[in-house]
Amino acid sequence: MEMHNRNQSDLLPYEKLAILGIDREKADSLPMEVKEKLMAGEVTPIMQVSINARNGSIITMPMKLQMTTDKNGAPALIAYPVRAELNWERNKVLNLTQQEAERLARGEVIQKAVNVNGEKTQQYLQLDPETKSVIHRRVTDIKLEQRLKDMEKVNDIELGMQQKQQIREGKPVELNVGGEKVSVGIDLKEQQGFKIIK
């Protein structure tokens, strides 16, 4: 077990975590749940991080982290700071319209072409209610077609074309499975980016 933990720790993006004031010792002592979520590409629970400001002072703030890869496949770390509210005008990367911000605030998942690190890709966007930050993942990173096939096989149901299209657009679909109401759809807080809610 200890060996497994050590191997997993070796894969942590230490240089990226150090920017947030989490040195190797602190990273190794993170709770296992946090390390596992980081390694799996999931969004971590809220944690305190310290950042060196340009004026030399240290700013400590709560945020969630998520490990991903850049366009070259190198590890990258996304930080979702806790905010009082979604400030859609300040987020230049996502370039949200007021209408998109309102949809996110209502809990909707939206799909949008986003320019990240010079690469324009289709992304799913979802507002994290705890941090008021927008979580985003490439549409291609969420193996949606496979998730839908797996769900159909396991639950012995067949989704119609319209239902599949709704899910692709980020809208949840309510189904009746074995006499039980179930909602399925995109959830970027989940590792696989997809959730079945009973």
What are these regions (language model features)?
Residues M1-K198:
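Gram-negative host-targeted secretion-system effectors, predominantly Type III and Type IV
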